[in-house]
Amino acid sequence: MALQSQASEEAKGPWQEADQEQQEPVGSPEPESEPEPEPEPEPVPVPPPEPQPEPQPLPDPAPLPELEFESERVHEPEPTPTVETRGTARGFQPPEGGFGWVVVFAATWCNGSIFGIHNSVGILYSMLLEEEKEKNRQVEFQAAWVGALAMGMIFFCSPIVSIFTDRLGCRITATAGAAVAFIGLHTSSFTSSLSLRYFTYGILFGCGCSFAFQPSLVILGHYFQRRLGLANGVVSAGSSIFSMSFPFLIRMLGDKIKLAQTFQVLSTFMFVLMLLSLTYRPLLPSSQDTPSKRGVRTLHQRFLAQLRKYFNMRVFRQRTYRIWAFGIAAAALGYFVPYVHLMKYVEEEFSEIKETWVLLVCIGATSGLGRLVSGHISDSIPGLKKIYLQVLSFLLLGLMSMMIPLCRDFGGLIVVCLFLGLCDGFFITIMAPIAFELVGPMQASQAIGYLLGMMALPMIAGPPIAGLLRNCFGDYHVAFYFAGVPPIIGAVILFFVPLMHQRMFKKEQRDSSKDKMLAPDPDPNGELLPGSPNPEEPI
């Protein structure tokens, strides 16, 4: 029996401890000396009688090592949890319709009403000049800040809006933004002071529009994935219809009522938007709902973690992204000038034309067409060659701005405005796909937010500079020539981005090939692995 137990000990390994305990008490004098080994006090609390082998499995110490192995197996899968989260695209399937179409209508109202008012700022600017001309004859520079501030704040607040959207959700952020925009427009009707309208219309209305606009784009991803392109197309087409109708509406209101009552009528669109924003029922959880896996103990560490998360500057390590963002920011200096000063220029140069709002309708119509067409065209262009569409858009935008003073009839201005709207649609639509190509999908949101923030300051400064040139030279000719220069400079800068990206990609390929050549054999035994290069033939 002792020989068999030794042989089985070599064969069975750790389970032989149980066999030894079963064989020791049978016919051997060792039970008296059994309490001497200290590591195993559990199996012999009371010495059992020799002729009874049945109760021996009860004090069997074999389950102890089995429990230890099981505990290790339980802790092994913990670092990779399999709990499915709704915040990821893999664990969530959007409904692809249903209540989502109500959300699409709300997003269409949001985009159309916000940009319909902002794109018609030229009419509001001319109405504002009529009120301020009695106080100051050279008011073009001061009055241009009102519309420029409102448009610039939409872009300037974009990085901050992304933080609020992530923490509070789309519904709360959009509703609060629409409420602020309503307050800004409504309070603008109770004051005639230009400095107060800087705050009420320029800052309050502009910031409110930014907080209401960005969640309308994010919420579509909660309800659509496979049909997201269709949903975005419906929103773009609907907002274009708004952009075409708002110039006619504002001009009609300006002819019948004063500017103050016009602000009150426009504020009703923001009130309706505030109600429609309540339909932004989120289907994906915000980051506040997802528990953090890493415990942040102190308040200081938690604050630093949030700063690293939301103000991640890693996108600026990409040289191509820095050049691309700088080129677009440079082009934005003259981008918004025609929207603000075109109506006043037509009133001065073509005083016999009464339907000046037709020019803004043309810009809105071709802008919507450009957004629809550019999406399909950009899908067929691989990689960063999409930037060449932006290069072409900025070149045409700059040339068309310079051609505005050269037009001697109203029909020529209509043709110029058609091209201006088309360039606007191409430029805006392909911005997100280019950001995905430059920094990847994980950092694309931050890249777009930083880009919009960089565009804010040039867009705010452009119209007042053009108004200052109008005051200095007495007409808008030099102002529109100035507006055409920055887009052309931006186009030249953007032209080199794909070339530099291709050069950097080839350099990385050469470096990686050198690393592979200098890398040691991955097989420690020196055997030839499948797919490895053929070794040299033996001599």
Swiss-Prot record:
Annotated consequence of substituting P463L: In MCT8 deficiency; impaired thyroid hormone transporter activity; does not affect localization to the cell membrane
Effect of G147R: In MCT8 deficiency; impaired thyroid hormone transporter activity; does not affect localization to the cell membrane
Composition-biased stretches (Pro residues): 42-64
Effect the entry attributes to changing G484D: In MCT8 deficiency; does not affect homodimerization activity; impaired thyroid hormone transporter activity; impaired localization to the cell membrane
Presence of the UniProt keyword ATP-binding in the record: no
Coiled-coil portions: none
Resulting phenotype, H118A: Reduction of thyroid hormone (TH) transport
Effect on the protein upon substituting L360W: In MCT8 deficiency; impaired homodimerization
UniProt feature, compositional bias: Acidic residues: 31-41
Chief location: membrane
Modified residues (N-acetylalanine): A2
Gene Ontology CC terms, in alphabetical order: apical plasma membrane; plasma membrane
Pfam families, sorted: MFS_1
Extracellular side of membrane: 118-143, 193-200, 251-258, 344-356, 408-409, 469-477
Effect in UniProt of substituting R371C: In MCT8 deficiency; impaired homodimerization
GO MF annotation, one: amino acid transmembrane transporter activity
Subcellular location: Cell membrane; Apical cell membrane
Effect ascribed to mutating G490E: In MCT8 deficiency; results in a mild clinical phenotype; retains some residual thyroid hormone transporter activity
GO biological process: amino acid import across plasma membrane; amino acid metabolic process; monocarboxylic acid transport; negative regulation of neural precursor cell proliferation; thyroid hormone generation; thyroid hormone metabolic process; thyroid hormone transport; thyroid-stimulating hormone secretion
Summary of the function given for this chain in its UniProt record: Specific thyroid hormone transmembrane transporter, that mediates both uptake and efflux of thyroid hormones across the cell membrane independently of pH or a Na(+) gradient. Major substrates are the iodothyronines T3 and T4 and to a lesser extent rT3 and 3,3-diiodothyronine (3,3'-T2). Acts as an important mediator of thyroid hormone transport, especially T3, through the blood-brain barrier.
Quaternary structure, from the entry: Monomer. Homodimer. Homooligomer.
Miscellaneous field: Abnormal brain development associated with MCT8 deficiency may be the consequence of either decreased or increased intracellular T3 concentrations.
Name of the featured protein: Monocarboxylate transporter 8
